[in-house]
Amino acid sequence: DQPGDVKTHKQYDVNYLFFKI
């Protein structure tokens, strides 16, 4: 896993959470 991938994953998680709400 690359640092960039981790950042993207974190942002994706946030977007997913926001969308779920």
UniProtKB/Swiss-Prot annotation:
Location in or out of the cell:
Secreted, Extracellular space
| Spans through the membrane | none
Pull one GO CC term from this UniProt entry: extracellular region
* A single GO molecular function term of this UniProt record: oxygen carrier activity
Listed A to Z, the keywords are: Copper, Oxygen transport, Secreted, Transport
Tissue-wise expression: Hemolymph.
Please indicate which superkingdom the organism of origin belongs to: Eukaryota
User: What's the family?
Assistant: Belongs to the tyrosinase family. Hemocyanin subfamily.
Q: What does this protein do?
A: Hemocyanins are copper-containing oxygen carriers occurring freely dissolved in the hemolymph of many mollusks and arthropods.
Protein name per Swiss-Prot or TrEMBL: Hemocyanin subunit 1
Record the organism.
Answer: Maja squinado (Mediterranean spider crab)
